[in-house]
Amino acid sequence: MRNFDLSPLYRSAIGFDRLFNLLENNQSQSNGGYPPYNVELVDENHYRIAIAVAGFAESELEITAQDNLLIVKGAHAAEQKERTYLYQGIAERNFERKFQLAENIHVRGANLVNGLLYIDLERVIPEANKPRRIEIN
């Protein structure tokens, strides 16, 4: 019997949680990559992504949503002064993080607070897909 590790898909797919909960049998989820992030289920139809972007100014961050793909980029402005580090433990590299969004997931806003970039998402169910009551005659 083969086991498939779906955790790499789960980390960057938002809105598919019901499907992954059925497919994923207590698979461990690793949080590799830069920058680190969390995906929070706020309620049944709302999600929040928190990305650790300490050291980035708001003007150095770019968020793009196209089709079902959310792209977050961070690019430091070119620094003119060369520094000599005795120890460098803080990552200062540029990044691009992509999140695959499920159908009907829309970005509602973003804000930067204390080095964390919060991106709010909402599942918007079209009227045609909502359950409707059928009258019995």
UniProtKB/Swiss-Prot annotation:
It is found in: Cytoplasm. Keywords: Chaperone, Cytoplasm, Stress response. It comes from the Bacteria. Its main location: cytoplasm. Monomer. Forms homomultimers of about 100-150 subunits at optimal growth temperatures. Conformation changes to monomers at high temperatures or high ionic concentrations. One of its GO terms (cellular component) is cytoplasm. Belongs to the small heat shock protein (HSP20) family. Pfam families: HSP20. Residues 28-137 form the sHSP domain. This is Small heat shock protein IbpA. InterPro entries: A-crystallin/Hsp20_dom (IPR002068), ACD_IbpA/B (IPR037913), HSP20-like_chaperone (IPR008978), HSP20_IbpA (IPR023728). One of its GO terms (biological process) is protein stabilization. It comes from Klebsiella pneumoniae (strain 342). Associates with aggregated proteins, together with IbpB, to stabilize and protect them from irreversible denaturation and extensive proteolysis during heat shock and oxidative stress. Aggregated proteins bound to the IbpAB complex are more efficiently refolded and reactivated by the ATP-dependent chaperone systems ClpB and DnaK/DnaJ/GrpE. Its activity is ATP-independent. CDD domains: ACD_IbpA-B_like (cd06470).
